[in-house]
Amino acid sequence: MTMQRIFGCAILNIRETALQATQSSQDRRDELDVCLAVPSAQSACEMEIGMKILLINGSPKGDRSNTLKLSKAFLEGILEIDKDAEIRQMNLSEKKIAPCRGCFACWNKTPGKCVMTDDMQEGIEGELWADLMIWSFPLYYFSVPGLLKNFIDRQLPMNLPFMEEQEGQTGSGGHPSRYDMSGKRHLLISTCGFYTAKNNYDSVTKLFDHVCGAGQYESIFCGQGELFRVPELKARTDEYLECVRQAGREYAQKQAISEDAKEKLRELLYPRDVFEKMADASWGVEKKSGEKEDPVLTFTRQMAALYNKDSFDQKERVLEIRYTDLGKAWQLSLIHI
């Protein structure tokens, strides 16, 4: 069985052989951790001590979320500067929040109060408490996950029913807030499975232009999000997480992220061709047939995708990788064309 990879001036052939050797790699998960302050009541006069932050984790994966790694890095940066910052984390995957019924009782029969009693009350209380809301979520089908959209829908009791456009909204109509939200700040942090975030978040930004007001929130959108769970790529993903951490430091100082930091955050983790080869190989199925392929071949493909074509010195080589525990081997051939 022979598969070909073409890298500019070289062809990389992958060929199975009947030999055995090196051990297959073991996954090593190095989880980022962040010290979350214990929620406690604070009076208005204590607000100057530290920022109050509500982290809304909209990933169905909960604490296993790839995006959450970025959000925690951002919080680490904030805590380096603002050691008195108080942080509450709300994992929507662990909450019982029913879909909005569209009954509008919260506007006329029980103003400001939903007729359903569930965990959404905790969310509304958290939003009223916080100075900064961090919306942490993966991109699902070019929008937010259903859990998060449900949470957004259930914010209806926070609005008044009257037609009144708010600052920064789109000009197509709106409803005024029931509460003074003028001092609230918002940050969107999201990862997606495409090689770039560019042009993939149009519907997300349109949604939050209505929710928060255009220009009234910051955002960190990162492509290649699945790489944050791959231990073998930790050196590169840690570099990116440090950029996110720096953005957190800046935000703690200026309540904004500098253009230099934003430019670094827009950088790709890997070039498009490298990432897409890794991504395609990760599914473990044949590209043409869609049938499941040998997992050893899948692993070999992923390694081959990281080959640096600029290092090719015009000398043809064969690299044989032996998986002794499985009794299999594959050859990678560099061929000048």
Residue ranges and their predicted role:
Residues 4, 20-26, 42:
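Low-complexity, intrinsically disordered or signal/transmembrane-proximal segments
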Residues 217-224:
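Beta-strand-loop-alpha "switch" segments that mediate conformational coupling across diverse proteins
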Residues 161-214:
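Short, glycine-/small-residue-rich phosphate/pyrophosphate-handling segment
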